[in-house]
Amino acid sequence: MKLLMAVEVVARRQVTPRVVQLTLRPAKRAAFPAFRGGAHTILVLPDGKRRLYSLTSDPDRPELWQVAVLREAAGQGGSAWLHEAAAIGTRLLASHPQQGFALAPEAARHILLAGGIGITPFLSMLPELRRAGADYEVHFCARSEAEAPFLPELRAALGDRLRVWIAQRLDLARLLACPAPGTHAYCCGPARMVQGFAEATAHWPAGTTHVEHFAGIPRAEAQQGEAFEVEIASSGAILPVPADRSLLEVLRAAGHGVDAACEYGACGSCVVQVEGGEPLHRDVCLSPAARRRSMTACVSRGRGRLRLAL
């Protein structure tokens, strides 16, 4: 696990019927480590569950962090616990900030596209954009105004930089048809929106599009597929991975302390190095180059036998 810190809940706010915002302070230090907009932390719950949340607070305020938690009816209980039991005074463990999504410093213009709870990584980017005097616009899609977290604050802060799309589909192909030189586009939202963004920006210059995934494949699907085997390079042990179990489960049962947070192939916490064999990738976080030498243990599988650098 990444470096952990003790944190305390000092405020909570019901942003929408399904989204609660928690304000955290460090329990044993004066300030949190520095981060850039778009970073996330992993919260460790009392039962050991680990959940990834974007930091929504201003990076220039290191004395407090804020996260927004969407209550997921089909989740594994982590979001429900935070909604029901994380009262003021509750202590948790949190990882140091992790930066997989960030503003491109070389960009002349930024287009930010969010769907629902996908607005959260952008909330910590907006203060950076304002301080830099940057050229930017924000497109925010939601099923209804009641389900659009932080919408009143965004309208007040952004004015005509904000375009809101309520109960209507944003025409990504039209919006992103002609990338101006120096423009970078960023997207975070439901899988369908992210896929549409990828298709609409397929012709953009390499390195000018950026995606944060909040969903991958369901955990039940990760536990389905053909059986395969893994060889542990350090010991030569052969571990069978049955068709109805994930590689992560098998590795942990064998005593290998592989980290994990989202467990749907989006965060990269459970990446293991592959020395041989053919992985069957199901993640949404690894680049093509990274996939040649690593895989996510939570959702990806293998064909035949894999050799892992463990």
Predicted features along the sequence, with ranges:
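A short, compositionally biased
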Residues: R36-G38, E221-F228, A266-G268
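N-terminal pre-ligand scaffold of iron-sulfur
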Residues: Q224-A260, Q273
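Local cysteine-cluster metal-coordination motifs and their immediate loop/turn environment
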Residues: P121, R252, H256-H281, S287-G304
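FNR/FR-type flavoprotein reductase catalytic core
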Residues: S79-G236, P240
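Short hydrophobic/aromatic patches at helix-to-coil boundaries
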Residues: R307-L310
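A short, sequence-level motif marking secondary-structure junctions
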Residues: G37-A39, T56-D60, A243-L248, C285-P288, ...
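Ferredoxin-reductase
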Residues: K2-R91, S95, A108, A142-E145
